[in-house]
Amino acid sequence: MDNGRIVRINGPLVVADNMRNAQMYEVVEVGEPRLIGEITRIEGDRAFIQVYEDTSGIKPNEPVYRTGAPLSIELGPGLIGKIFDGLQRPLDSIKELTKSPFIARGIKVPSIDRKTKWHFVPKVKKGDKVEGGSIIGIVNETPLVEHRILVPPYVHGTLKEVVAEGDYTVEDPIAIVDMNGDEVPVKLMQKWPVRIPRPFKEKLEPTEPLLTGTRVLDTIFPIAKGGTAAIPGPFGSGKTVTLQSLAKWSAAKIVIYVGCGERGNEMTDELRQFPSLKDPWTGRPLLERTILVANTSNMPVAAREASIYVGITMAEYFRDQGYDTLLVADSTSRWAEALRDLGGRMEEMPAEEGFPSYLPSRLAEYYERAGRVKTIGNPERFGSVTVASAVSPPGGDFTEPVTSQTLRFVKVFWPLDVSLAQARHYPAINWLQGFSAYVDLVANWWNTNVDPKWREMRDMMVRTLIREDELRQIVRLVGPESLAEKDKLILETARLIKEAFLKQNAYDDIDAFSSPQKQARIMRLIYLFNTYASKLVERGIPTKKIVDSMGQLLPEIIRSKAAIKNDELNRYDELERKLITVFENLEKEAGT
């Protein structure tokens, strides 16, 4: 294979000639240090290469080595609990090799350890017919994850050979498939190009909610398994803490956290917290179901794009095994800024605010890889990839290109409001600007499995919050005393919704995670208060008298979110009894 020659270097962009037979998105090794790069444009025999490592010290006329392959990652046992860089190089292996806290340029480390032996249990036998995606055996990778070994997509035929149960490395052939006369070995590990979505049989409608334990996300703006969500917000509004809560407490089987161009100390927080935290669904350490991709702001700009694709490809691989996976990306704005930087260096025509004109199509390609699917292969199974991405608009301007284009492709919008954050209301999600297109799809699940009145209670809360915002404008002008009694009640109910339900402390042991049943019990208390109080107000009892009659009951309801554990929900029965007793006494007074 002919080697190219460097003609020009412009930061992470390298131009090489003598590359006539090169292909788009082919991986090349640049210069004497053999830095990893990817061809992003070809003009004649010149190739424009985005280099995923620091190019300082490279000179014109140095060689460019072609590999003939696209940027691919290794998929197999050994991914869970690992921390990778943006090119799927394991950081712990690099540290052992270099004895340094920094990643050396041009370093080559296998993504999956070649020496570790995994206990493989076959699920098929010689002579069975298999196709791409068929499960041929399992490896118990962690106590939480049963790693299902799949036939690579596009391989099909009859099994000529299957190994017996035992311990094997990821490079040992565990089966041989006779594919039209060719013998194709199947190993525990397979490779897949990151820019190509993995195939599936059929895309399905997402109907089951992805429970996160965060009340405003689960109830007001729910996301379904296989859904897409964006969390835009200015600096300091709580994007990272919200995403970390998602990664920690969500009901996904596998969580992939991609730190794309964010500060290194945020990834350090993750690495410090995850080993000590327990998964609320299983009681096991969270790291047993998590993969971290660390591509921090001080790493090369071009690798941000690779890290996003590496993350979504790993998510698709676990989806193909029949698991619900969650990809958390923080943040896609940094990826878009990398595209802008490279586009400028390649002298492309800029579009709005200097971003390249193909920004919308890149974002669309990324979000379209989410979804709930019927997978290829046997036995029949269903999996999902849910994508939640932070967007960091400068100054909190939601009209800037990355936020406005992202809004076109996501079905859930969780906008963070800096004024709420400054008022210490966390999560600072603005309940007036946010939306979810999955409410109708997931309402049936909530009504069936949690509370038959869930949809009714949720809609009452949303209506109250919208009406309260309208009334606040009037209160600013003429004061609260001029309001009708029913409007005063709306202000009181809205205060209860915000304090008892929407506010949630991510650092409180009890309040950090609310089970669906606990969320429904808090909603029920608010719903009962609003229903009974509305009837009394209609009978002429002032809102102030109703609130005064409650005494310490309303503060007790507000405190219950951090006082009552998820397994002590019978304590809500007592609160309900107290609430109903107060209203019965008020009704007796009104009747006399």
From Swiss-Prot:
One of its GO terms (biological process) is proton motive force-driven plasma membrane ATP synthesis. This is A-type ATP synthase subunit A. It is an enzyme of class 7 (translocase). It catalyses: ATP + H2O + 4 H(+)(in) = ADP + phosphate + 5 H(+)(out). It is found in: Cell membrane. The gene is atpA. It comes from Saccharolobus solfataricus (strain ATCC 35092 / DSM 1617 / JCM 11322 / P2) (Sulfolobus solfataricus). Keywords: ATP synthesis, ATP-binding, Cell membrane, Hydrogen ion transport, Ion transport, Membrane, Nucleotide-binding, Translocase, Transport. GO terms for cellular component: plasma membrane; proton-transporting two-sector ATPase complex, catalytic domain. Its EC number is 7.1.2.2. Component of the A-type ATP synthase that produces ATP from ADP in the presence of a proton gradient across the membrane. The A chain is the catalytic subunit. GO terms for molecular function: ATP binding; ATP hydrolysis activity; proton-transporting ATP synthase activity, rotational mechanism; proton-transporting ATPase activity, rotational mechanism. PANTHER family: H(+)-TRANSPORTING TWO-SECTOR ATPASE, V-TYPE PROTON ATPASE CATALYTIC SUBUNIT A. It holds the Pfam family ATP-synt_ab. It is a peripheral membrane protein.
